A protein has these predicted regions:
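Non-catalytic alpha/beta scaffold blocks inside enzyme catalytic domains
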Residues: 1-172
Length: 175
């Protein structure tokens, strides 16, 4: 069954285009579903099946869209949370541009600028315009708030490997 944090305790990436069909066949229910820069209503050939699933509270209890832009899928969300553009968040990127292998690292410009000015923001949103959360920090913070004592097994995935029992920081995540 598709329950509790999407197929197990945690799922970090979007599910397949089959999700609304699984829900329609009563193979499970999504208590909470986050979409992240994801617009299946527009991009998938069966967008109307997504509309049906997202509108049916017996299939998707709560839909939260993390997106830098308003889109067709966000329209059917219970909450729409702004997500930073590339200059407002950390990101690892690699594109097929030639026959070589490479990876690039992006970091939030204003957070780095604040550091160079002697300020140390705890969260990137404190430096970003409009207090936009950085996605990785959002998931870390949300996980700690959902599971403060660690009884659900969620918090353990976001513990610092360098400071026992402490919350993972964004710098440690990308170290």
């Amino acid at each position: 069954q598709v329950t509790q944090f999407i197929m197990g305790k945690l799922s970090h990436y979007e599910l397949s285009y089959l999700l609304p069909h699984f829900l329609k066949e009563n193979r499970g229910k999504m208590s909470v579903y986050f979409t992240r820069v994801f617009n299946p209503v527009w991009t998938y050939p069966d967008g109307f099946s997504w509309i049906e699933a997202l509108r049916d509270e017996s299939k998707v209890g709560l839909h939260i869209a993390l997106t830098p832009t308003w889109n067709e899928t966000a329209y059917f969300a219970d909450y729409v949370l702004p997500m930073g553009h590339s200059s407002e968040r950390h990101d690892l990127i690699s594109y097929e541009t030639h026959a070589g292998m490479w990876i690039a690292y992006r970091q939030p410009v204003l957070r780095e600028y604040a550091r160079r000015q002697g300020k140390e923001p705890e969260f990137t949103y404190q430096a970003n315009p409009g207090e936009v959360w950085e996605e990785d920090e959002f998931w870390i913070e949300l996980s700690w708030r959902i599971d403060p004592e660690g009884k659900l097994g969620v918090k353990e995935h976001f513990l610092s490997p360098y400071r026992e029992g402490e919350k993972l920081t964004i710098d440690e995540y990308y170290r």
